[in-house]
């Protein structure tokens, strides 16, 4: 069942075109920065990193534990490998959010990292 908290979390997702980051309004840039900060906090959390690595090790052990070579065993192996790839894609998603946050900060700063004044 969808509750108000879930709806608020879904609506908090920034709906901006990252490909046109230089044309964003200050409000949109603030959304990107807030979202990126949340992602950065997750990536810096040692407990989160520990659980991600434990999950990947657990999945790797599950793959090694499949001894058979029939179609069902191969399908289980493939499913587990997709789970491992999924967690890697999630971490990449978080890293991209941080990268976009850094781009937004650079755009809003009066002097960018190259020493040029932003107009």
Where do the protein language model's features map onto the residues?
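Intrinsic-disorder/low-complexity detector
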Residues: 1-119
């Amino acid at each position: 069942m969808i509750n108000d908290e879930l709806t608020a979390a879904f609506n908090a997702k920034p709906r901006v075109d990252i490909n046109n980051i230089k044309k964003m309004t200050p409000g949109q840039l603030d959304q990107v920065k807030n979202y990126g900060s949340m992602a950065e906090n997750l990536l810096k959390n040692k407990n989160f990193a520990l659980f991600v690595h434990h999950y990947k090790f657990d999945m790797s052990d599950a793959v090694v534990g499949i001894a058979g070579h029939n179609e069902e065993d191969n399908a289980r192996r493939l499913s587990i490998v997709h789970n491992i790839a999924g967690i890697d894609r999630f971490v990449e998603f978080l890293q991209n959010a941080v990268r976009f946050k850094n781009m937004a900060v650079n755009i809003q700063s009066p002097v960018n990292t190259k020493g040029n004044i932003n107009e």
